[in-house]
């Protein structure tokens, strides 16, 4: 289990990005109010369908939709071999409560950009 460490991108010079090769189950931290982007680079030969699950996420109310069960986590769309997927973590903050686990991304490379 690897920890995906954010790379702070606020700089006047170049920034080296800390990439993590994903395993069966990886973790990362999220703090509401920060601007973080999760980037998954599918360097594998097949499609991946990652899932992000905060173990403290239960339900959330969304206007126009109602109460939504968050316990299964947030499943990303299929990421084809060679594609790069970027997710603004603020958009799924309700799923990011407690310990956050990323599964389904085996052998892909991931990093978090903090801007």
Give the ranges of each region predicted by the language model.
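Surface-exposed, low-hydrophobicity beta-strand/loop segments enriched in small/polar/acidic residues
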Residues: 2-115
